[in-house]
Every structure is written in structure tokens, then in C-alpha cells.
UniProtKB/Swiss-Prot annotation:
Belongs to the SELO family. HAMAP family: YdiU_SelO. It holds the Pfam family SelO. Mg(2+) binds at N249, D258. The keyword Methyltransferase does not apply. This is Protein nucleotidyltransferase YdiU. It catalyses: L-seryl-[protein] + ATP = 3-O-(5'-adenylyl)-L-seryl-[protein] + diphosphate; L-threonyl-[protein] + ATP = 3-O-(5'-adenylyl)-L-threonyl-[protein] + diphosphate; L-tyrosyl-[protein] + ATP = O-(5'-adenylyl)-L-tyrosyl-[protein] + diphosphate; L-histidyl-[protein] + UTP = N(tele)-(5'-uridylyl)-L-histidyl-[protein] + diphosphate. The keyword Electron transport does not apply. Its cofactor is Mg(2+); Mn(2+). The active site is at D248 (proton acceptor). ATP binds at G86, G88, R89, K109, D121, G122, R172, R179, D258.
Length: 480
């Protein structure tokens, strides 16, 4: 089957990009590709059979229909207007036409200098490329909207970060790379007609059912707000900290995008800061819902030339509604509740308080709770707490709450184990794969990808265990 590509972004939004080709890496070689995703997209296996160079995966060749561009956008970074940003090292190669008529961006990250590189070198390093591939695939298999990773190319090109590393490229796929920052760019350039063109493009291609509706812009922004709310809930309930929620890292489609200093909670710490460059804690774990609303308000501001302010404020309420409604639903599922009762939040917050005091492992606590039997007065989870009396008191109230519903253990446990993962991408697991890959051993990288495809399957190895002490102290920054 021949892959078919189009260039809708290039053809319809000429003010938003610069056309250019990737800059090649030295001794580029394909070290991993996503076989399952490739099969789903009917990508010929022959494209991955690269024995001399890295082919399209290293930007050495283009497939028919590809028209590479680097996109321009702006944004607020750490709450401050940063001006023009853009794809400083990534190139949108083209948009794959799928059988259902939709498209999928092929975006090559680490593809070299662009007009938007500012002080950067246009490169991505092997370390950050591996982290993004693992994170995006982990999130996908957790059921969380995200970009996807299709391939990784390593090289011998030296790249200077805190230390000297080697350059790499990631082929990232997404339904769209449209960001809040695209709208901010033209709003602050006082070009409202181009802001409206972006909105028209989004509606035409992603919400075509509203094209001819008079209130199409309001409906569209309401949906952007609601999707953002649901995404943040998924992050919070699985214990994911993005680390750098700048407006240019926010997706119009409600996707998790731009994996940098991310982290999954180990010990439950609501104030967890994954990014050691975030000195003020703006993007700490428990502040993500507030930051997302702030970012939506910045996006709303760009839409004021063609949407009434009252309508924008009502749309922003959709974010809060989606956040609260979806959070309640998801946390009840995590606790094994099938109905909503007035004291559920009290019970949940008591558990969180106990976990915070004890430094309980976030994922393991909920996973172990999912094995609870109503008739059993004890739980293996009890042994993980120092204050057994406090846990016993909470557990008695929890079991009493379970007994208010006529649901047997098997059905409840099944529900809980579908939303409480046994495996998440802990930073130390990613680092172990990176360390091996930097020595030329890709086995752990490949195996970890396999493990992350089954996050809801119980395991008795270290992929599902608490991290070693050194693994809790890993520092992650925006450097990539």
C-alpha cells in the first residue's frame, strides 16, 4: 500500500510557516520504531528496513506528497509573554491521509536549525528523544490523549547541553500540532484576521459539523475548553506532572504534547515539581488545573475580535464544569464506587492526607487498593503504612462505603484495575533505558516500550515496584 500525504497546513495557512528541509545527522541510524502503530497506519515494513543511513526517519528522504515546513507561534512561558517562538528544531514533513479522510501530522523533531531556533542549535539529544518516545506511548496506553512516537534515530553528531551528548531525531505523530501559541502569535502582531483563519482551519478540519452554524466559534472554543479540562483530569488522576505548561505547549485538540521535564508521582506529594528549572513551582502537580485555566484565558483573549466576551466567559465555565465532573467520575472509578454519595470527597481527601503524611507511593497505593475484598478486615496495603491505626480507621470507613452498593468484589476490582495502572513511566525506568542506549545497548529501550503497552497488568518485577532511592532524586530540566 502506498502512503498518501497532503499539505493542508502549508496550502491553507501560508503566514504560519517557513518551508525548509531537515539538516542531516552524522552516521544516522534507526534504533527503534513503533511496529504496532506502523501496522495500524499501513506503513510498509520496507520503510523501516534501513541498512544505509536512516531514510525518511532521519530526514534523508521525503515520501511523495511531503512538503516540509517549520511552524511559527508565540506564547507565555512561566506566566510571562515570551514573544515569537516556533518550531526551533522540528519540521512538519507532511500530513498522512488516512482511510477515514482524516490526517495525521508527521513531525520530525531534532531536524536542525530553523528560522525559529533563536539561540538553539536545532537539535534534540538521544536522552530527551527516548524520554518523549516512552512518555507519549505510555500515555497512549493509559488512555490519555497524546501525540505518538513512531521512530527514533541516533547519530554520532555531538550536541552540547549540560554535557556533550549525541543528536537524535524523533518522528512524532499527531492529529494536529496546532497550539494556543499559534493564536497568540497573530493576536499580538495585531493581525486578527489571521487568528480567525486559524479558527476556521480548526473548525473546517477537526469540527466540520459546525462549519455552517452561526455560533461556530463559540461552540468550537467551548469544546477546546472542555477537552482541556478532561485532559487535565487524566493527568491528575494518573499522577502525571507535565513540567512546562507554557501556552505554546498547549494543544487545541486537548492532546498531551511536548514532553520535556515530565514526571509521574512516586511518593504522593501534591506540590511535586518535576522541572528543576521551575524555581517558583508554577507548574507543580497540584497547580496544573489552575495553570490550564490561565492558559485558556490567554487563548480566549486572542479570540475577542470575533467572539463576545460574555460568550468567552461562558465557554471558560465549560472548563471548570468538565474538570469537576470528569474528576469526580474518574476518582470514583479509582476507588471502586459505582454511584456518587455526598461524603465521597471526604473519604478521598482523608486518603490523600494519609498518603501525603506517609509518603505513600501514588500508583501502588491505588493499585493495591483495587484488590480489596469487602469482607476482609485487613489489606496488604496496610503494611505500607507506618500509622496503622490511622489506616485502619480509614479502611473501615472505606469498606463501609463499599457495602452501600450491591456490587460484588470481582466486578468492582475489574473496574478499579482498568483505571489504576500497575505500571507508569517512572523517571528512573526511563533513565535506565537511556543509560543503556547511550552505551549502544537498545534492549532495555525496546523492552520498556513493550512493558508500557500493558500498564494495567500486574507484575512482580521492578517495573511495577517503588523506585530505588536514587531514582527518586533524578533531576529533570527543559534541556533537551
Amino acid at each position: 500500500m502506498t502512503l498518501s500525504f497532503t499539505a493542508r497546513w502549508r496550502d491553507e495557512l501560508p503566514a504560519t510557516y517557513t518551508a525548509l528541509l531537515p539538516t542531516l545527522l552524522k552516521n544516522a541510524r534507526l534504533i527503534w520504531y513503533n511496529d504496532k502503530l506502523a501496522q495500524q497506519l499501513a506503513i510498509p515494513a520496507s520503510l523501516f528496513d534501513v541498512t544505509n543511513g536512516a531514510g525518511v526517519w532521519g530526514g534523508e528522504t521525503l515520501l511523495p506528497g511531503m512538503s516540509p515546513v517549520a511552524q511559527v507561534y508565540s506564547g507565555h512561558q512561566f506566566g510571562v509573554w515570551a514573544g515569537q517562538l516556533g518550531d526551533g528544531r522540528g519540521i512538519l514533513l507532511g500530513e498522512q491521509l488516512l482511510a477515514d479522510g482524516s490526517t495525521l501530522d508527521w513531525h520530525l523533531k531534532g531536524a536542525g536549525l530553523t528560522p525559529y531556533s533563536r539561540m538553539g542549535d536545532g537539535r534534540a539529544v538521544l536522552r530527551s528523544t527516548i524520554r518523549e518516545s516512552l512518555a507519549s506511548e505510555a500515555m497512549h496506553y493509559l488512555g490519555i490523549p497524546t501525540t505518538r512516537a513512531l521512530s527514533i534515530v541516533a547519530s554520532d553528531t555531538p550536541v552540547q547541553r549540560e554535557t556533550q551528548e549525541t543528536g537524535a531525531m524523533l518522528m512524532r505523530l499527531a492529529q494536529s500540532h496546532m497550539r494556543f501559541g499559534h493564536f497568540e502569535h497573530f493576536y499580538y502582531r495585531r493581525e486578527p484576521e489571521k487568528v480567525q483563519q486559524l479558527a476556521d482551519f480548526a473548525i473546517r478540519h477537526y469540527w466540520p459539523q459546525w462549519q455552517d452554524v452561526p455560533e461556530k466559534y463559540v461552540l468550537w472554543f467551548e469544546e477546546v475548553a472542555a477537552r482541556t479540562g478532561r485532559l487535565i483530569v487524566e493527568w491528575q488522576t494518573v499522577g502525571f506532572s507535565h513540567g512546562v505548561m507554557n501556552t505554546d505547549n498547549m494543544s487545541i485538540l486537548g492532546l498531551t504534547i511536548d514532553y520535556g521535564p515530565f514526571g509521574f508521582l512516586d511518593d504522593y506529594d501534591p506540590g511535586f515539581i518535576g522541572n528543576h528549572s521551575d524555581h517558583q513551582g508554577r507548574y507543580r502537580f497540584d497547580n496544573q488545573p489552575s495553570v490550564a485555566l490561565w492558559n485558556l484565558q490567554r487563548l480566549a483573549q486572542t479570540l475577542t475580535p470575533f467572539i463576545e466576551i460574555d460568550a468567552l466567559n461562558r465557554a471558560l465555565d465549560r472548563y471548570q464544569d468538565a474538570l469537576l465532573t470528569h474528576y469526580g467520575q474518574r476518582m470514583r472509578q479509582k476507588l471502586g464506587f459505582f454511584t456518587e454519595q455526598k461524603d465521597d470527597n471526604v473519604l478521598l481527601n482523608e486518603l490523600f492526607s494519609l498518603m501525603a503524611r506517609e509518603g505513600s507511593d501514588y500508583s501502588r497505593t491505588f493499585r493495591m487498593l483495587s484488590h480489596t475484598e469487602q469482607q476482609s478486615a485487613s489489606s496488604p496495603l496496610r503494611d505500607t503504612f507506618i500509622d496503622r491505626a490511622a489506616f485502619d480507621a480509614w479502611f473501615d470507613r472505606y469498606r463501609a462505603r463499599l457495602r452501600t452498593e450491591a456490587v460484588d468484589d470481582a466486578l468492582r476490582q475489574q473496574q478499579m484495575q482498568r483505571v489504576n495502572p500497575a505500571v507508569v513511566l517512572r523517571n528512573w525506568l526511563a533513565q535506565r533505558a537511556i543509560d543503556a542506549a547511550e552505551q549502544g545497548d537498545m534492549a532495555e529501550l525496546h523492552w520498556l516500550h513493550e512493558v508500557l503497552r500493558q500498564p494495567f497488568t500486574d507484575r512482580d518485577d521492578d517495573y511495577a515496584s517503588r523506585p530505588p532511592e536514587w531514582g527518586k532524586r533524578l533531576e529533570v530540566s527543559c534541556s533537551s
